[in-house]
Amino acid sequence: MKFWGSVLALSFVVFLFLTGTLAQNVGSIVTSDLFDQMLKNRNDARCFAVRFYTYDAFIAAANSFPGFGTTGDDTARKKEIAAFFGQTSHETTGGTLSPDGPYAGGYCFLREGNQMGNGYYGRGPIQLTGQSNYDLAGKAIEQDLVNNPDLVATDATVSFKTAIWFWMTPQGNKPSCHDVITGRWTPSAADTSANRVPGYGVITNIINGGIECGKGQNARVEDRIGYYRRNVSIMNVAPGDNLDCYNQRNFAEV
């Protein structure tokens, strides 16, 4: 019985490995050097977030969310990381300050419009916005962000955790960004009717579709795609199809 028990246990581990569900450390995909390469100018002295977004804070936050950057095969994991940093680099911007081109300049800003005080304005990599999101994110990461929203701009690990929480969490009729980029989202009939198809473009729709999607070609969507293309090039993976949301209705329109 011990022999067969060992065989079954080993078989289960092999199954988890082959299906990409065996827990892995995000650091095996995102090394410190890769982090610095993707976010090359985040510590430019002209950036308001200089020295805030650290590699160690990212890894600590990432490893607290099972599945983030560890789902699927090597290509799938790299695409998720490229997409996450593509979207959040657009949110935190700074491309105009970069001598290496507009898509090497993300993670320059920390607070939306460099505001101060305890309002629920955009903060951190995903620019977490609105009391509801601060409440939900805070409960998920066990921090009181309703009464202390600026923790998202003063604690780098908390800041990354709020961004990854948003990335991993479906809300209403929106799938999670994680499920979209890892190929685990199947569009509903309503999604198909709204031209919301699997790909990076739907992630833009999830994050800011009401402003950016369904309006034809526009600079903001192009910027998000530019960051993503740079990241997948660095990681040597293909970007996939359906990168924009130019012709997608946003999720609020059902």
From Swiss-Prot:
Biological process terms in GO annotation: cell wall macromolecule catabolic process; chitin catabolic process; defense response to fungus; polysaccharide catabolic process
Predominant place of localization: secreted
EC class: hydrolase
Active site: E91 (proton donor)
Location(s) in or outside the cell: Secreted
GO-annotated cellular components: extracellular region
Catalytic activity: Random endo-hydrolysis of N-acetyl-beta-D-glucosaminide (1->4)-beta-linkages in chitin and chitodextrins
Cystine pairings recorded for this chain: C213-C245
Signal peptide: 1-23
InterPro entries from the UniProt entry: Glyco_hydro_19, Glyco_hydro_19_cat, Lysozyme-like_dom_sf
Keywords associated with the record: Carbohydrate metabolism, Chitin degradation, Disulfide bond, Glycosidase, Hydrolase, Pathogenesis-related protein, Plant defense, Polysaccharide degradation, Secreted, Signal
Transmembrane feature ranges: none
Pfam family membership, one: Glyco_hydro_19
GO terms for MF: endochitinase activity
EC number: 3.2.1.14
Purpose of the protein: Defense against chitin-containing fungal pathogens.
Family: Belongs to the glycosyl hydrolase 19 family. Chitinase class II subfamily.
Protein name: Acidic endochitinase
Organismal lineage: Eukaryota, Viridiplantae, Streptophyta, Embryophyta, Tracheophyta
